[in-house]
């Protein structure tokens, strides 16, 4: 029991010290701790969430849960009808959308006579042939409309155009990112693809903040296939949406077990992520940790200064305590308890703000970045780790100044001598 006496007395002194301290001082320290915790969690969470928004968009509106594409040595997915029959017999699959993809050129104002040296109002693009109903069931393409109407299966000579192909929605003057001028819903453009030339009407504009979608022109597949000489029913991409609860890795392996990998690449949405997206995830996570670490150092210094000033101010009081027999260890423990109080209350307040306020709000109202809808990515494990880091840093910052003051001469402290 004697070993616990310094702890009990230290706790009593800490409680007394907190109660007698200025209410505004306590509030200020707690706010600093809460803001420090938010800095540790939110800054890295938003930076990671910015890239997570890109990943979410690509998964939702492009690859879906499983993505099948042509092998590198082939121009298309061989034996597509066989693959579709395999997919049809897997009960965990909710919907499938095969696509035909071909490079092409879109032209606006193509009837205007230009000099030979002029480039013209044109842009290189990717031409996609889709079944509008199947594509919408898998990727929700119709939800990306920002102008006009969605395609129907009978919409021949009508197309959807990605926003990055139009100057009205992507006004960047660069040869690397060509965009059409004076083109909007209702405009007629000329499409050149695989030697075929077709005049089509823009029925709708789509924007997703993913280049794979926003730099495409979408045709009804039954019209595009004859234009590119594709009469064999082979596709270039197949996006697969799973039923809720189905595991993409398990279904991918099941599809591969049926021999589909002999004719195409079968990937989960994570496998199909572009490498630059994966690299950006790691980079932004590192940046978030660096910025959070700076905030942690600032908070530690703040706690150190507050505890040190508090201890210096009560130097005479500390000397009297030592004079009546209270050990220096007990006094140090009391200041550690004070630091624990500020750390626990501040961290708890920060957790409430994150999980009850910021996280649900940003999920419902993502931050509108130019290339993604940013969300706040926080995990329970990550939150616990950061809370522990802040707690330990606060304890150290509370102990060191108390130790420095307590080690002083007792008589000098009582008499106020330096």
Predicted regions, residues:
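N-terminal Sec/SRP start-transfer signal
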Residues: 1-41, 418
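Peri-transmembrane interface segments
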Residues: 20-27, 248-301, 310-314, 321, ...
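Alpha-helical transmembrane segments of integral membrane proteins
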Residues: 29-39, 285-305, 339-350, 385-386, ...
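Hydrophobic, regular-secondary-structure patches
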Residues: 38-126, 133-136, 147-150, 257
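Short beta-strand boundary microenvironments
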Residues: 118-176
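Basic-flanked hydrophobic alpha-helices used for secretion and membrane insertion
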Residues: 149, 160-267
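Transmembrane alpha-helical interface segments in multi-pass membrane proteins
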Residues: 295, 308, 317-362, 393, ...
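Short helix-loop junctions at transmembrane helix boundaries
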Residues: 333, 347-392, 399-412
